[in-house]
Amino acid sequence: MQRWKLTLEYDGRPFVGWQRQDNGPSVQQALEEAIYRFTQETVTVFCAGRTDAGVHALAMVASVDLAREATADKVQAALNFHLKPHPVAVLRVEPVAPDFHARFSCLGRAYLYRILNRRAPAALEAGRVWHVQGGLDAEAMHEAAQRLVGQHDFSSFRASLCQAKSPVKTLSDLSVARVGEEVRIVARARSFLHHQVRNMVGTLKLVGEGRWTADDVSRALAARNRSAAGPTAPAAGLYFTEAWY
């Protein structure tokens, strides 16, 4: 039995999220079915971050145990073949120690949020960005974002159905920068609450529009109440970009 570390890229649009659910196709289901077609083994694949419906991944890390003997190149080629036509690609396959676990061994995770900030709609990037027509002040957003960096009670930025035992998280980085017509937000932490990144982005958008100040963000954080913060940004602009071990 060999444990494998898989690095995946996927378009989240056709999926109900990473995790298997009864209401539609999931990334986990697509991957486990591809593995079955390759090995005839029924397995459970674990991932570093269980993304929601419509959320994408540039480098999601997963782990799985396979009894079939094969090289890393063979596993990668077979899974990419059997994953068709799903928009999922296996970028890398590596053999790892039996105690490696994509979720529980993970020391940190990073997300990217993309806002297309222009008047014209998104023709090529529809479903992959949040289209915001009105001008956004990325520098003001970045300044306000620093109020959220560090260890805090993020109750104001967690989903109502969040199952985390504690709302306290340590945000190691939250940066905002304009790149051409895009405003890009990068968030890094050991772990995140459900919807935390999207709720922070929705709040920072209010700052970018000039409707909120950095002090308003601090007050929202201190309130420890979801209704005190901004709206939840759409799933379309969110990407899981990195997991480190």
Swiss-Prot record:
Q: Which UniProt keywords apply?
A: Isomerase, tRNA processing
Q: What is its EC number?
A: 5.4.99.12
Q: What class of enzyme is it?
A: isomerase
Q: Which residues bind substrate?
A: 111
- Protein name from the UniProt record: tRNA pseudouridine synthase A
Provide any one GO MF term from the record: tRNA pseudouridine(38-40) synthase activity
From the UniProt record, give one GO term of the biological process aspect.
tRNA pseudouridine synthesis
- What does it catalyze? uridine(38/39/40) in tRNA = pseudouridine(38/39/40) in tRNA
Organism, scientific name: Rhodospirillum centenum (strain ATCC 51521 / SW)
Q: Which family does it belong to?
A: Belongs to the tRNA pseudouridine synthase TruA family.
Mind telling me which NCBIfam families this protein's record contains?
hisT_truA (TIGR00071)
Catalytic center at which residues?
52
What's this chain's function?
Formation of pseudouridine at positions 38, 39 and 40 in the anticodon stem and loop of transfer RNAs.
Q: Gene name?
A: truA
Q: Where, if anywhere, are coiled coils annotated? A: none
Pfam name, any one: PseudoU_synth_1
Please tell me whether the keyword Hydrolase is annotated for this protein: no
Q: Output the CDD domains linked to this UniProt entry.
A: PseudoU_synth_EcTruA
Asked if the record carries the keyword Isomerase, the reply is yes
Q: Quaternary form? A: Homodimer.
